[in-house]
């Protein structure tokens, strides 16, 4: 059995699309730039791919150094308004100069966001960050209280993350999502967990499984990783 031959117009169209696609790949415009601004963290999560801790023994990258890279290596080759900067860690909220960093990149024309475990986020800090230009935020929230607190190794981590989520979903000026790292105990409960998020007003949920790296490569954590680790799915 042979397939139908493409007509001349379709062949030309496919060739043009192929050429345009190859051009886009070669151009590879920068849209999102992550700055891992610290390896310090106020938690010691079992699944941390960077093995972050309260005192990692590695100093934070100075803000001046990051701004120098931004000014000399990034801005000359990109339009700032086309690039979203994401501050990540570690836990970004342990940096005392986070608002200063936000103001500096905003002054340069960049939008910026952050990823946080929510433990240190309250209404006052969120207001301070937004005054410094915060545009987007992701909150890590790995399951119901038993699963989340086990992974995060802190009895208040679920409560604080949920409080942070309640703050951000009520802020219309923020783009946000909730991120869930799925472990085996949560696989069968994801549908139920989704209902909890919906009840809290969450509209954007991202789930993934972390392959073994950093502290997540430890035997005790690997036993909790379901098959299909590394798969990402987003629910708008």
Residue ranges and their predicted role:
Residues 1, 57, 131-132, 136-142, ...:
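Radical SAM enzyme [4Fe-4S]-AdoMet core and its adjacent flexible, acidic
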Residues 3-136, 224:
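Conserved alpha-helical substructure of the radical SAM core
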